[in-house]
UniProtKB/Swiss-Prot annotation:
Residues 125-148 are annotated as: Disordered. This is Large ribosomal subunit protein uL3. The gene is rplC. One of the primary rRNA binding proteins, it binds directly near the 3'-end of the 23S rRNA, where it nucleates assembly of the 50S subunit. HAMAP family: Ribosomal_uL3_B. Keywords: Ribonucleoprotein, Ribosomal protein, RNA-binding, rRNA-binding. The keyword Phosphoprotein does not apply. The keyword Mitochondrion does not apply. Part of the 50S ribosomal subunit. Forms a cluster with proteins L14 and L19. Also contacts proteins L13 and L17. It comes from Deinococcus radiodurans (strain ATCC 13939 / DSM 20539 / JCM 16871 / CCUG 27074 / LMG 4051 / NBRC 15346 / NCIMB 9279 / VKM B-1422 / R1). GO terms for molecular function: rRNA binding; structural constituent of ribosome. GO terms for biological process: translation.
């Protein structure tokens, strides 16, 4: 499954066939190939790529040796893609084609501590008719002596956001290889400047326009 690392620049819109298309601009690559894993030596086929330069003085000795063995400068981020065997010494945006379906993974924006209405879309309590200080409460969270506890996974107030989120089957609208830019239709998780992982769509089908 081919993939590349990049940075979310932001959203804009472009005109295509007299239609405005909302797109997310991603600055992707070039990502140097740090390691190629084979079935003979590692038990599976994969490629490890790096992204975002890192000062050598901030890299520990084992990782310095890892990068030196590959003959590439140290990078801040390393990711592995199985079943991907690109040519050359780096991965660029031209691994994808316009119209291709991809999956985008990012870290969602942190929202801090939120209640059940914002976090889980609960309806809350009545707005009036005797309701007092119950407008945004979740309601009952359990039973009685049996089971005598709150079940694991119960949807309650708490920290929201800052989670790994993947949006599937996004369309590649345009590729600007000279600028290392990919324009993807729709929204991608995370704030501007955040790390984005772009992969071939895992669930795309020919009926949906996947490749």
């Amino acid at each position: 499954m081919k993939g590349i690392l990049g940075t979310k620049i932001g959203m804009t819109q472009i005109w295509k066939n007299d239609r405005a298309i909302p797109v997310t601009v991603v600055l992707a690559g070039p990502c140097p190939i740090v390691q190629r894993k084979t079935a003979q030596t590692d038990g599976y086929e994969a490629v490890q790529i790096g992204y975002a330069p890192k000062a050598e003085r901030k890299v520990n000795k084992p990782m310095q040796g890892h990068f030196a063995k590959a003959g590439v400068a140290p990078t801040r981020i390393l990711r592995e893609f199985r079943g991907f065997a690109p040519d050359g010494d780096s991965v660029n945006v031209d691994i994808f084609a316009e119209g291709e379906k991809i999956d985008a993974t990012g870290t969602s924006k942190g929202k801090g501590t939120q209640g059940v209405m914002k976090r889980w879309n609960f309806a809350g309590g009545p707005a009036s008719h005797g309701s007092k200080k119950w407008h945004r409460r979740p309601g009952s969270i359990g039973q009685r002596k049996t089971p005598g506890r709150v079940y694991k996974g119960k949807r309650m107030a708490g920290h929201m956001g800052m989670e790994r989120v993947t949006v599937q089957n996004l369309e590649v609208v345009e590729i600007r290889a000279g600028e290392n830019l990919i324009l993807v239709k729709g929204a991608i998780p995370g704030a501007n400047g955040g790390l984005v992982v772009l992969r071939s769509a895992a669930k795309a089908s020919a009926a949906k326009g996947g490749k």
